[in-house]
Amino acid sequence: MSPPSATYDVVAAAATSVAKTNKPSTAHGSLTSTSTILDEFAGKWDDFSFGHIRESQVSRAMTRRYFEDLDTYAESDIVIVGAGSCGLSTAYVLGKARPDLKIAVIEASVSPGGGAWLGGQLFSAMVLRKPADRFLDDLGVPYEEEPSNPNMVVIKHAALFTSTLLSKVLSFPNIKLFNATCVEDLITRPAPAAGDGEGIRIAGVVTNWTLVTLHHDDHSCMDPNTINAPLVISTTGHDGPFGAFCAKRLVSMAAIEKLGGMRGLDMNSAEEAIVKNTREVTKGLIIGGMELSEIDGWHRMGPIFSAMMLSGVRAAEVALEVFEERKRECADKK
């Protein structure tokens, strides 16, 4: 289960602290003696009761909305594969920039957020390098300057960043998160380049419940569903059970020759390489975040999150640059 959306009451730093704390201007509520919610309920529990419901009404309230979403987003404008720190950052920027676009976010896990609920080695704090602090300012996430290095800032708990970003993404009316849903394949169309009769473009994704995907090897055939979209943004992370999926699929469908393979950890070179090389790798498919390290052979970045955020910003920028052209191509050849 994902952690709930976090609130944060700014407190004065201890006298021994030399770190400067960034304090967002937004106010945060807390349960105090003057809280409206306590005024509403405190001391009245003997007379408390919930309104009466019927179980089928609960079922219908859930299923009706979900199937309406499936119908609405069967034709999407943009699909984002992977709701980690990079994918959610992409969704946030796109949601703000283009509220007219239908954006589907597909996440294999029950809990979106990827590895961004904690820092390195299951520690709480999240470390990032400037100028990624500007993204935190835009989100309204508080952070501290790091006394040991003026180029670094620290969020007191990674979950504070992820819950804030996730809550903002989910508040956009044009974005739908389908979690516990796996992308099993890519929808393709022929797109021959000059002198090349075998080129392809990506035209959407093939989906299934994650629990179904995990059992294809021990159950009979369970066919998938589909979402058409002129542009797919893949941010599935480095190689793993579901990681680097689109990158690996491009190799198996002969769209690219081979993967570069992620190199050993080097934060300084890895972060800049990931941000600067976030791009459309084939028509209709943008790849960002650590998935790029598998395609290009960049270094691993480890427990630092600046590039994840700004690669998401860059992926959104690339999407805005190419979207209208990809949309026209899909309209021309359905």
From Swiss-Prot:
It catalyses: [ADP-thiazole synthase]-L-cysteine + glycine + NAD(+) = [ADP-thiazole synthase]-dehydroalanine + ADP-5-ethyl-4-methylthiazole-2-carboxylate + nicotinamide + 3 H2O + 2 H(+). Belongs to the THI4 family. Homooctamer. The keyword Cytoplasm applies. GO terms for biological process: thiamine biosynthetic process; thiazole biosynthetic process. One of its GO terms (molecular function) is iron ion binding. Keywords: Cytoplasm, Iron, Metal-binding, NAD, Nucleus, Thiamine biosynthesis, Transferase. Its main location: cytoplasm. It comes from the Eukaryota. Involved in biosynthesis of the thiamine precursor thiazole. Catalyzes the conversion of NAD and glycine to adenosine diphosphate 5-(2-hydroxyethyl)-4-methylthiazole-2-carboxylic acid (ADT), an adenylated thiazole intermediate. The reaction includes an iron-dependent sulfide transfer from a conserved cysteine residue of the protein to a thiazole intermediate. The enzyme can only undergo a single turnover, which suggests it is a suicide enzyme. May have additional roles in adaptation to various stress conditions and in DNA damage tolerance. This is Thiamine thiazole synthase. Gene3D superfamilies: 6.10.250.2840, FAD/NAD(P)-binding domain. Binds 1 Fe cation per subunit. PANTHER family: THIAMINE THIAZOLE SYNTHASE (PTHR43422:SF3). It is found in: Cytoplasm; Nucleus. NCBIfam families: sulfide-dependent adenosine diphosphate thiazole synthase. Substrate binds at C86, E107, A108, G115, V183, D223, H238, M290, R300, M301, G302. It is an enzyme of class 2 (transferase). Its EC number is 2.4.2.60. One of its GO terms (cellular component) is nucleus.
